[in-house]
Amino acid sequence: MAEESPKNSAAEIPVTSNGEVGDAHEHGYNRDLKHSLPSGLGLSETQITSHGFDSTKEGVTEAGASQGSSAPPLPCVLSPSRVAASQLTQHAGGQRTHTKGGPVILADEIKNPAMEKLELVRKWSLNTYKCTRQIISEKLGRGSRTVDLELEAQIDILRDNKKKYENILKLAQTLSTQLFQMVHTQKQLGDAFADLSLKSLELHEEFGYNADTQKLLAKNGETLLGAINFFIASVNTLVNKTIEDTLMTVKQYENARIEYDAYRTDLEELNLGPRDANTLPKIEQSQHLFQIHKEKYDKMRSDVSVKLKFLEENKVKVLRNQLALFHSAVAAYFAGNQKQLEQTLKQFHVKLKTPGVDAPSWLEEQ
């Protein structure tokens, strides 16, 4: 059975009477070979011999091999050999593989952002570890910390004042709420007196002037309420925006101080150790990082000093005006001096909201 296989494959190749390969088979294979070759390369430009396929001479016929043939010499013709087909396939596949080598470089480029993020995470973790160690050392009394006595005293005073201002703000809001309820009650009481003055003829005058008194008190109460609300809004802006912004800068300054002390401690520990070829690069790198954080600390300390100075000036200016408004409005209200109360609001440019009237739109304000 094993010997029949070569005979069957050889029997499939048609041969003419003079021993040459049949023209029909030759033209069919040449057409297949043209399809398998790369574009732009003709069959006549390709010279293929039997030595190109591991010395396999199966299916290769040279022109003029048979004696007595008057036909002109034919070029080398390659029969449909499995070895030839496999090598052509490998050659074409190799070219396709070569052209697809580009995306590998792109894949390396895609990895670059991930590596950068990984490096940022590594630096952040190292910095967090150093700062946490510094904080724990300070709380345990083992580590040293840099202290600016004058600046630290100003920061402590600012935080203490902020708590006191918040307490004043809370009490003023309570007073405003209670005054609003009292004004609302006075209005209702004035309306009730006015109604009874119309229905009770014998007590018409008594109910009438009580109604007028309650309405006047309600009107003055609304004026005082406007002054108190203006005072609350101004103090709220000072406490929760201006002072809070300064405290945010103070927080950044404290973080910069912790980082500075952490890298300063590392540099001091390295300087106390031996100096050799292994430790010198570490000392230089630690010195570089220490210098960076020292400059950052100095910059934040300067920013905090400037902000504290401007905050103090702004705070004095705002509170001086608001405290004068609060005092004048309350004194005029309880003295029953309606004219002075109205002048106080005009002096501090306080506008009262008319009940039932919405605020003007931005087009009307133009």
Swiss-Prot record:
Record SMART domains: Arfaptin
Location(s), subcellular: Golgi apparatus; Golgi apparatus, trans-Golgi network membrane
AH domain span: 146-346
Subunit structure: Forms homodimers or heterodimers with ARFIP2. Interacts with non-myristoylated GTP-bound ARF3, but not to GDP-bound ARF3. Interacts with ARF1. Binds with lower affinity to ARF5 and with very little affinity to ARF6. Interacts with ARL1. Interacts with ATG9A.
Segments of skewed composition (Basic and acidic residues): 22-35
Region (Disordered): 1-78
Stated role: Plays a role in controlling biogenesis of secretory granules at the trans-Golgi network. Mechanistically, binds ARF-GTP at the neck of a growing secretory granule precursor and forms a protective scaffold. Once the granule precursor has been completely loaded, active PRKD1 phosphorylates ARFIP1 and releases it from ARFs. In turn, ARFs induce fission. Through this mechanism, ensures proper secretory granule formation at the Golgi of pancreatic beta cells.
Chain positions found as Phosphothreonine: 354
Keywords from the named record: Acetylation, Golgi apparatus, Membrane, Phosphoprotein
Biased composition (Polar residues): 44-53
GO cellular component terms listed in the entry, alphabetical order: cytosol; Golgi membrane; trans-Golgi network membrane
Cysteine disulfide partners in this protein: none
One Gene Ontology molecular-function label: protein domain specific binding
Residue numbers carrying N-acetylalanine: 2
Residues recorded with modification Phosphoserine: 5, 36, 39, 69, 79, 125
GO biological process: intracellular protein transport; negative regulation of retrograde transport, endosome to Golgi; regulation of Arp2/3 complex-mediated actin nucleation; regulation of protein secretion
Name this polypeptide is given: Arfaptin-1
Keyword presence, Oxidoreductase: no
Record-linked InterPro entries: AH/BAR_dom_sf, AH_dom, Arfaptin_fam
Species: Rattus norvegicus (Rat)
One Pfam family here: Arfaptin
